[in-house]
């Protein structure tokens, strides 16, 4: 799929993160390909995966999951703040010839957030 079509997809994966602590937190939001230990098939490399991300109504992307090293957002979330996300995922059209040969490959994408919270200001 082209980047333009990928970013225009109506179907999105909607989620939010909320800081329920008493201090700001520095976070990394990752989209990882976590393959179950019981899976014995072929795994799709992240170099074929593109994403677009909408954060509180502002759009970012397209981005290659491989090029961003799986970190799709990195920022500060303040106490009691909620950040809303809409994510679109597609296969990179520029790698179309490779993708034609990947019919039996699977991806096991999972969101993971890592955060460090400190009582002092993070501005």
Residue ranges and their predicted role:
Residues 43-92:
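Signature of Gram-negative chaperone-usher
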Residues 1, 39, 95-99:
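Low-complexity, polar-biased intrinsically disordered regions enriched in Pro/Ser/Thr/Gly
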Residues 3-58:
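Surface-exposed interaction patch
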Residues 7-25, 73, 78-123:
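C-terminal, structured domain-capping segment
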């Amino acid at each position: 799929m082209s980047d333009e079509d990928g970013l225009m997809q109506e179907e999105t994966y909607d989620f939010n993160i909320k800081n329920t602590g008493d201090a700001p937190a520095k976070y990394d939001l990752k989209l990882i390909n976590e393959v179950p230990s019981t899976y014995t098939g072929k795994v799709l490399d992240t170099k074929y995966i593109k994403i677009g991300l909408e954060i509180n109504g502002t759009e970012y992307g397209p981005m290659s999951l491989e090029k961003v090293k799986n970190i799709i957002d990195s920022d500060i979330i303040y106490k009691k703040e909620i950040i809303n996300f809409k994510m679109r995922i597609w296969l990179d059209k520029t790698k179309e010839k490779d993708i034609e040969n990947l019919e039996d490959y699977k991806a096991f994408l999972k969101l993971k957030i890592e955060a460090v919270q400190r009582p002092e200001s993070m501005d």
